[in-house]
Swiss-Prot record:
May function in recognizing stalled ribosomes, interact with stem-loop structures in stalled mRNA molecules, and effect endonucleolytic cleavage of the mRNA. May play a role in the release non-functional ribosomes and degradation of damaged mRNAs. Has endoribonuclease activity. Coiled coil: none annotated. GO terms for molecular function: endonuclease activity; metal ion binding. Pfam families: eRF1_1 (PF03463), eRF1_3 (PF03465). GO terms for biological process: nonfunctional rRNA decay; nuclear-transcribed mRNA catabolic process, no-go decay; nuclear-transcribed mRNA catabolic process, non-stop decay; ribosome disassembly; RNA surveillance. The gene is pelA. Gene3D superfamilies: 3.30.1330.30, eRF1 domain 2, Pelota, domain A. It comes from Saccharolobus islandicus (strain M.14.25 / Kamchatka #1). This is Protein pelota homolog. Its cofactor is a divalent metal cation.
């Protein structure tokens, strides 16, 4: 995402959309009553016929729809302003926002949390592709902020089939991996697996892709369980430290350990977390994305809590529905805090 302009007087942010993650962030930030200015098309009656006419409109937002791993955000609302000749003011309309589009978002007042979220997204550039490989199977995935997208999950030919099968299988994996690298243009590749097959794949990848950094690590299996395992590793933090999905999994693991051994250093529930924040006791808070898509009053209360946490140098981790820890956190009221010190 690029922030092209921010007009403080109008509370208007002009943005250029560059990725799926950008669309997901806007889905979280946009609220009912916000106004957006964007290009769109609409069927307009011209005599006995109708044509889809391109135009720029001002839409008062009712709600947004975002489907994971698509390139589109749907913004539903009422047209507040449009070219006079079309006579469509006051009509319901949906803007389809795609990668490459520009949009202006106007709020009555931008919260510090929402602005910081925009700025953080604008600063974010790194992407990584993860390939888990074993002699008989492999999995290729890419993390987005809204979750992990599985690109490929396949079996390989048995080692007993013919001589040289290891090299052939390594080339098969490397070739498919290279195609995804061309498609997504990541900054780095992480190859992991339980045996030495990953080194064979790495050789092939380095021959095909000369200018991509390849990291190698060990993992117990080339499966989704192995993917969950690798997301908790320090190597992931080093390669993509700004991806909250990896950080969130590690923080949740820490919270569960504390609940078992030092439960006084963890609290959960909105009121309990709010009290801990007021005392300056919160080190890290994890919350599910649903809490920022709730009714205006609850959302406003949560945003105030998040602003207070940031002012007191606490860490905020937003957990999307596709995260492996989402349901675990939801069962704990959806919001949990790791504390700096014990409180009553």
């Amino acid at each position: 995402m690029r922030i092209l302009e921010f007009d403080e007087k109008r509370q208007a942010a002009k943005l250029h959309i560059e990725s799926e993650d950008d669309l997901w962030i806007l889905h979280l930030i946009l609220e009912k009553g916000d106004k957006v200015v964007a290009k769109t098309t609409r069927d307009i009656g011209l005599g006995k016929e109708s044509r889809r006419i391109p135009m720029t409109i001002v839409l008062k937002v009712d709600y947004t729809e975002f489907q994971e791993f698509t390139n589109r955000l749907r913004i539903h609302g009422i047209i507040e302003d449009a070219p006079e000749r079309f006579g469509i003011r006051g009509a319901h309309h949906t803007i389809n926002l795609d990668i490459g589009d520009e949009i202006i978002i106007i709020k009555q007042q931008w919260s510090k949390y929402a602005l910081d979220k925009l700025k953080k997204q604008a600063d974010k550039r790194s992407k990584i592709i993860i390939a888990l490989v074993d002699f008989d199977e492999y999995l290729i995935a890419i993390p987005f902020e809204q979750g992990i997208k599985i690109l490929s999950e396949k079996s390989l030919r048995s080692l007993n089939e013919e001589e040289g099968i290891i090299e052939q299988n390594a080339l098969e994996v490397a070739t498919e991996l290279a195609e995804y690298v061309k498609q997504y243009n990541p900054d780095a590749i992480l190859l992991a697996g339980p045996g030495f097959f990953k080194e064979e794949v790495a050789k092939k990848v380095n021959n095909i892709l000369k200018n991509k950094k390849v990291y190698i690590d060990s993992v117990s299996s080339a499966t989704r369980a192995g993917l969950h395992e690798i997301l908790k590793r320090d190597i992931i933090d080093k390669i993509m430290s700004d991806y909250e999905i990896a950080i969130g999994a590690k923080k949740m693991e820490k919270a569960m350990e504390l609940l078992a051994k030092q439960p006084e250093l963890v609290t959960y529930g909105l009121e309990q977390v709010k009290n801990a924040v007021e005392m300056g006791a919160v080190e890290t808070v994890l919350l599910i994305e649903d809490l920022l898509s709730s009714n205006n009053q609850e959302r406003l209360a949560i945003e105030r809590i998040l602003e207070d946490i940031e002012n007191k140098r606490g860490e905020i981790i937003l957990v999307p529905k596709e995260s492996p820890i989402y349901f675990e956190l939801k069962n704990l009221t959806g919001i949990l805090a790791i504390l700096r010190f014990r409180i009553n």
